[in-house]
């Protein structure tokens, strides 16, 4: 029984779910917004916000060793050095004073082919 197991499963087994979340996170870093199903958007929001928190901590790190360790953790999640640098050096500085809530989900209606509920997930940009 799955009582009190609150992980977003998105209809996939473990390694497939991790790969999906990794790919969606990479797309968010690269394009700052993506359109996906609402369930996947909610799952990737949780995953990506943890990465964003690590990126902000890496940017604020006083010791070089701590920054390198956090960058390696982000690399483990994203798998691309270029995206790690973009996240830590370009995106994270915009959110240094923000305590979470780095992404927002907006519903955009049903998908044409099968009627699945689609959502836009994007980085929140403060002016």
From Swiss-Prot:
What are the UniProt keywords, alphabetically? Ribonucleoprotein, Ribosomal protein
Q: Does the keyword Ribosomal protein apply?
A: yes
GO terms for biological process, alphabetical: translation
Out of the domains of life, which is the source?
Bacteria
Pfam families for the chain: Ribosomal_L17
SUPFAM superfamilies to which the protein is assigned, alphabetical? Prokaryotic ribosomal protein L17
* Coiled coil keyword on record: no
Recorded GO MF terms: structural constituent of ribosome
- Which Gene3D superfamilies does this UniProt record tie to the protein? Ribosomal protein L17
Task: Give me the Gene Ontology terms describing cellular component.
Answer: cytosolic large ribosomal subunit
Q: Which InterPro entries match?
A: Ribosomal_bL17, Ribosomal_bL17_sf
Q: How the protein assembles, per its UniProt entry?
A: Part of the 50S ribosomal subunit. Contacts protein L32.
UniProt similarity note: Belongs to the bacterial ribosomal protein bL17 family.
The protein's name is Large ribosomal subunit protein bL17
